[in-house]
Swiss-Prot record:
Keywords noted in UniProt: Cell inner membrane, Cell membrane, Membrane, Protein transport, Translocation, Transmembrane, Transmembrane helix, Transport
Keyword hit for Cell inner membrane: yes
Protein's cellular compartments: Cell inner membrane
Keyword Acetylation belongs to the record: no
Protein's recorded name: Sec-independent protein translocase protein TatA
Species this chain originates from: Flavobacterium psychrophilum (strain ATCC 49511 / DSM 21280 / CIP 103535 / JIP02/86)
Similarity comment: family membership: Belongs to the TatA/E family.
Transmembrane segments: 4-21
InterPro entries: TatA/B/E (IPR003369), TatA/E (IPR006312)
Assembly and interaction partners: Forms a complex with TatC.
GO (cellular component) term, any one: TAT protein transport complex
Amino acid sequence: MGRLGVTEILMILAVVLLLFGGKKIPELMKGLGSGLSEFKKAAKGDEVPDSKKDETKE
């Protein structure tokens, strides 16, 4: 009952396409991808704190 089949996934994609339109979906996916990328960087600890960024610019 908790698993999605191919038919259910296709129906969900069709509804998303109807709601957002073909032009808006690439923008949404780009935003999602950049958000996931930032989250992964933060989880790794690769980001330098703001105070250290200011010191390196000077």
